[in-house]
């Protein structure tokens, strides 16, 4: 999906009934794993708050988050990021550590802390959910 107007539209909450979107998103990330480490549902044309990412802290397993919301962050830094929806890289502000509330694939509430590269990936994908393009 490269429609900037669609990508700039904040996504709606995910819920029961979005299981196929989750599967499609995981499959799309798997198919693009050589050039992509995370995706949000709006990148496949679905305006739902669903993200998936490769979690290196879990041996490269794909993690699914529904309705993610970053609740705390620290350690701001400037970086360059790319995106499948855009050409080239762009400068952006990220945080070295984040705390996040989300729901797992079974819609159970979760809270977690992430740091480093994984935290950066999550921030990028949550931005997609919020209609923010780097």
Predicted segments, located by residue:
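Positively charged
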Residues: 1-134
